Amino acid sequence: MEEIKVHIGKTVALMNDNIDTDQIIPKSFLKRIERTGFGEFLFDSWRYLPNRKPNPDFPLNAPDRQEATILITGDNFGCGSSREHAAWALLDYRFRVIIAGSYSDIFYMNCTKNGVLPIVLPREAREKLAKIAADENVTIDLPNQQVISSVGTYPFEIDATWKNKFINGLDDIAITFEHIDAIKAYEQKVDSI
């Protein structure tokens, strides 16, 4: 997992509430188990017209928002069926940070396990951030747990374990390898019984 200590990036806002995993990535695109190649299908039914041309009215298609790495969105983001592909699609598209009012528990966990930092902020803060100009950067300061922007600085909460994983770029496998000596010692002990 790629570390996130301080992330500086541009934003795009999709302020809908209750965006479910089928809207994030439709089930028709879930026929692979590789983690890459899903970004082109992110928000597919909204991003594309029936003829597969980009929908000019969809925020992610705005020419001045093409460099966005921070998605600002509504409440209950990632609700619906458990679908790790949704986190893969967001990351593959290039989003490193999602700022929402709340998340489905399973979706939140899928994001944290796949290197997408889910931040919870109140609606008032998100509405201000949603109005930031396309050429402005927003800073996510994870060690100090702050979203810093021209419209304000907003503190956020994150579990200490997840914070450590993001700051150090550790996924579950990397954490397991940190304990490899203890694992080997246990295996030798069990094998000798």
From Swiss-Prot:
CDD domains in alphabetical order: IPMI_Swivel (cd01577)
Q: Name one Pfam family in it.
A: Aconitase_C
Q: Recorded GO terms, molecular function?
A: 3-isopropylmalate dehydratase activity
Q: What is this protein called?
A: 3-isopropylmalate dehydratase small subunit
Please give the SUPFAM superfamilies that the UniProt record associates with this protein.
Answer: LeuD/IlvD-like
EC class:
lyase
Q: Which GO terms describe its biological process?
A: L-leucine biosynthetic process
Q: How does it assemble?
A: Heterodimer of LeuC and LeuD.
For this UniProt record, the keywords arranged alphabetically read as follows: Amino-acid biosynthesis, Branched-chain amino acid biosynthesis, Leucine biosynthesis, Lyase
Native source species: Listeria monocytogenes serotype 4a (strain HCC23)
The record lists the catalysed reaction(s) as:
(2R,3S)-3-isopropylmalate = (2S)-2-isopropylmalate
Query: Is Amino-acid biosynthesis one of the keywords?
Result: yes
EC numbers on record: 4.2.1.33
Q: What does this protein do?
A: Catalyzes the isomerization between 2-isopropylmalate and 3-isopropylmalate, via the formation of 2-isopropylmaleate.
Q: Per the similarity annotation, which family is this?
A: Belongs to the LeuD family. LeuD type 1 subfamily.
**Taxonomically, which superkingdom?**
Bacteria
Gene Ontology cellular-component terms for this entry are: 3-isopropylmalate dehydratase complex
Q: Which InterPro entries match?
A: 3-IsopropMal_deHydase_ssu, Aconitase/3IPM_dehydase_swvl, AconitaseA/IPMdHydase_ssu_swvl, IPMI_Swivel, LeuD
Question: Which pathway does UniProt place it in?
Answer: Amino-acid biosynthesis; L-leucine biosynthesis; L-leucine from 3-methyl-2-oxobutanoate: step 2/4
